C-alpha cells in the first residue's frame, strides 16, 4: 500500500505504508576521508573600483553573502520516496480517485488551480484542469457519486464533473456562514456584510442515505457552526456549535446509524479567532441524525465518550505555548489569501 504525501512547495510524493526492512534502513552518506576545505571567495571588485549605483548595489549583496558564508546544500530525504508531480504554487490539498480501474490524483493550490493527473505510474501526465475559482483553494472532497467539491476563499463552493473538467454547480456558502453568525448574534454592529470573507477549513462527504443524493458537511474558519448541503439544493441546514468548528469524525451506533463527533475550539470565543473565552466548554460535541434529517445533540454518545471531551491535557514538558502559537495552529487557512500589493 502507498501513501500520497505533499509538501507546501507543491510536490507530491508516494511513500510505502509498510516499508520493508531494507527500506527502513536510514542511508547514511559516505563520510569523506577529509572534508574538502573551501577557500574564501572574494569579489574582484572593491568600493574603490566600483562607481555606478547598480554595480555598488551588486557589490554590497556579494559582500553580504560572503559574510553569511557558503550556503549548505539541501539535505536529501533519507527514506524511500518517489516524486510524482509538482505545482509551481503552494499545494493545499490532495485527493485520490479511481474510476473504471484507472486511478487519478487531484491536487489544488493557492493559485486557484485544480489539476487532474493520472495515478501511478503515470502521475506526470496531466489530464486537465478545473478552472473557475477566483481565490485560493483550501479543501477538496469527492462525493459517493464521483463529483468533486472544492472550496477555499471564494464566496461559493464549486461542484465539478472533474472527469470532463466541467463546473456543474455553485453553492453560496458565504451567505450561509454570515446568516449563522447573525442568528447567534456574533456579527458586530457596523460590519460591512458585502466585504465579509470566509475561508473553508473542512469538507466532508456523508454516506448516501438511501436516496442516492450526495450530501456534504462544511466548516468555515472561525465560524461556530457546521453546514449541511445536498447537491442540487442551495438551502443549507446549519448546526450551531458552542465553539468554532475544527474537525469532524463520523461513527455509527446501534441506536443511530449516523453520528457526528465535532471538535470545537474551547480556547477562543465563538465566532472569533483572536479573543480568548472566559467560560469553559467541552472540546467535543456529539450529534445524531434523526429520521427527518435534522441533527440533534446526542446525550447518550456524550456520556459514553465523556472521557475524550474532558481528557487529560497534553504534557508539554513545561513549555508554555503562547496564545499566538495556539491561534496560528488552529487558524491558518485565511493566511492563504493574497493581499493587494503583497508578493505572491
Enumerate the predicted regions with their spans.
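Canonical WD40 repeat/beta-propeller blade segments in eukaryotic WD-repeat proteins
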Residues: 1, 86-98, 131-142, 177-209, ...
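Conserved strand-to-loop turn within each blade of WD40 beta-propeller repeats
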Residues: 6-9, 107-111, 151-154, 220-222, ...
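WD40-repeat beta-propellers
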Residues: 12-17, 114-119, 157-161, 227-230, ...
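Fungal intrinsically disordered, low-complexity polar regions
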Residues: 16-79, 180-181, 186-190
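Beta-strand initiation motifs
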Residues: 21-26, 68-80, 121-126, 166-169, ...
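Short C-terminal beta-strands that terminate individual repeats in beta-propeller domains
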Residues: 82-86, 126-132, 169-173, 193, ...
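C-terminal scaffolding/assembly regions of large eukaryotic complex subunits
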Residues: 224-225, 230-344
Amino acid at each position: 500500500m502507498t501513501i500520497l504525501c505533499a509538501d507546501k512547495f507543491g510536490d507530491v510524493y508516494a511513500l510505502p505504508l509498510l516499508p520493508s526492512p531494507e527500506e527502513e534502513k536510514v542511508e547514511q552518506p559516505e563520510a569523506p576521508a577529509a572534508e574538502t576545505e573551501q577557500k574564501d571567495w572574494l569579489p574582484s571588485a572593491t568600493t574603490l573600483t566600483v562607481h555606478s549605483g547598480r554595480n555598488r548595489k551588486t557589490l554590497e549583496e556579494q559582500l553580504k553573502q560572503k559574510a553569511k558564508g557558503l550556503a549548505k546544500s539541501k539535505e536529501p530525504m533519507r527514506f524511500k520516496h518517489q516524486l510524482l508531480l509538482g505545482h509551481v504554487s503552494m499545494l493545499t490539498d490532495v485527493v485520490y480517485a479511481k474510476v473504471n480501474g484507472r486511478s487519478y490524483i487531484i491536487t489544488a493550490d493557492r493559485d486557484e488551480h485544480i489539476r487532474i493527473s493520472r495515478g501511478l505510474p503515470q502521475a506526470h501526465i496531466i489530464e486537465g484542469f478545473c478552472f473557475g475559482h477566483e481565490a485560493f483553494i483550501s479543501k477538496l472532497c469527492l462525493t459517493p457519486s464521483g463529483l468533486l467539491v472544492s472550496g477555499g476563499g471564494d464566496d461559493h463552493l464549486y461542484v465539478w464533473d472533474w472527469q470532463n473538467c466541467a463546473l456543474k454547480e455553485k453553492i453560496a456558502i458565504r451567505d450561509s456562514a454570515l446568516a449563522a453568525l447573525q442568528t447567534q448574534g456574533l456579527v458586530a454592529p457596523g460590519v460591512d456584510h458585502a466585504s465579509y470573507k470566509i475561508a473553508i477549513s473542512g469538507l466532508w462527504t456523508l454516506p448516501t442515505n438511501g436516496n442516492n443524493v450526495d450530501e456534504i458537511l462544511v466548516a468555515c474558519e472561525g465560524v461556530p457552526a457546521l453546514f449541511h448541503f445536498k447537491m442540487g439544493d442551495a438551502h443549507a441546514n446549519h448546526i450551531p456549535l458552542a465553539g468554532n468548528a475544527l474537525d469532524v469524525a463520523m461513527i455509527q451506533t446501534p441506536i443511530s446509524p449516523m453520528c457526528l463527533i465535532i471538535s470545537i475550539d474551547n480556547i477562543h470565543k465563538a465566532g472569533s479567532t483572536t479573543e480568548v473565552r472566559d467560560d469553559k466548554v467541552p472540546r467535543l460535541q456529539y450529534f445524531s441524525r434523526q429520521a427527518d434529517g435534522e441533527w440533534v445533540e446526542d446525550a447518550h454518545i456524550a456520556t459514553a465518550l465523556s472521557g475524550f471531551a474532558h481528557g487529560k491535557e497534553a504534557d508539554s514538558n513545561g513549555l508554555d505555548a503562547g496564545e499566538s502559537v495556539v491561534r496560528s495552529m488552529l487558524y491558518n487557512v485565511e493566511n492563504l489569501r493574497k493581499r493587494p500589493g503583497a508578493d505572491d
